[in-house]
Amino acid sequence: MRKFGFYILFIFSIIFGTENRKLGQTGFQFLSVTSDARSGGMADAMTTMHDKSTSLFSNPAGLSKQTERFDVNFSSNNWIAGIKHDAFSFSLSPSNGQFGVFGFSLLNVDYGELQGTMVWDNSQGFIDTKKFKPSAFAMGLGYGRSLSENFSIGGQLK
């Protein structure tokens, strides 16, 4: 009887425990878009490999591996449907990283011009409204520092 109860519980947990209902849409997805060619070429598998200012976009602790006094990066990607994604990052390592590495980043997305619509009781089910131009912008300040040869910390305020 005990095994039977376990099997019933196991079956119910498989059936109902994996339910994944999408209740809403997520925002700020532009923050997760690859911002540089090196990351894009490696399918974003860059979490532990950063040593430039671009680490601000995925792992700010990577700033601590920077060997130059400063680093600047600018990238611009034109996507389908007229979407334009621009990124800028700058990092500075005063005193050869003795005090850590400071960084600054900008992200901008221009989604182009879109036609607005509204639900309406007609044969199409909608009417056209005016056109609009959505965009998104993020700015961040970051810091990274090595605590040992194999351990670094970092963070960013956006």
Where are these regions (language model features)?
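Positively charged n-region of N-terminal signal peptides that target proteins for export
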Residues: 1-4
